[in-house]
């Protein structure tokens, strides 16, 4: 099972150049979550 997961954990050779971008992609939803608090702070948590 671990070998199967490791197979999916690595990008195919053709996509190795995009590895830095793929590493950042999971953080994008967190930025939106933080944006909600910044937005609400700007409007006074109405």
Swiss-Prot record:
Pfam families attached to this UniProt entry = PsbK (PF02533)
Any keyword Thylakoid?
yes
HAMAP family per record: PSII_PsbK
Could you give a single Gene Ontology term from the biological process aspect? photosynthesis
Task: Tell me the organism.
Answer: Prochlorococcus marinus (strain MIT 9215)
Q: What is this protein called?
A: Photosystem II reaction center protein K
Q: Name one GO cellular component term.
A: plasma membrane-derived thylakoid membrane
Residue ranges annotated as propeptide are: 1-9
Q: How does it assemble?
A: PSII is composed of 1 copy each of membrane proteins PsbA, PsbB, PsbC, PsbD, PsbE, PsbF, PsbH, PsbI, PsbJ, PsbK, PsbL, PsbM, PsbT, PsbX, PsbY, Psb30/Ycf12, peripheral proteins PsbO, CyanoQ (PsbQ), PsbU, PsbV and a large number of cofactors. It forms dimeric complexes.
Residues annotated as transmembrane: 25-45
Question: What SUPFAM superfamilies does this protein map onto?
Answer: Photosystem II reaction center protein K, PsbK (SSF161037)
Q: Does the keyword Cytoplasm apply?
A: no
Q: Which keywords fit this entry according to its UniProt record? A: Membrane, Photosynthesis, Photosystem II, Reaction center, Thylakoid, Transmembrane, Transmembrane helix
Function of the protein: One of the components of the core complex of photosystem II (PSII). PSII is a light-driven water:plastoquinone oxidoreductase that uses light energy to abstract electrons from H(2)O, generating O(2) and a proton gradient subsequently used for ATP formation. It consists of a core antenna complex that captures photons, and an electron transfer chain that converts photonic excitation into a charge separation.
Q: Which InterPro entries match?
A: PSII_PsbK (IPR003687), PSII_PsbK_sf (IPR037270)
Where does the record place it?
A: Cellular thylakoid membrane
Membrane topology of the entry: Single-pass membrane protein
Q: Which PANTHER family match?
A: PHOTOSYSTEM II REACTION CENTER PROTEIN K, PTHR35325
Can you tell me which family this protein belongs to? Belongs to the PsbK family.
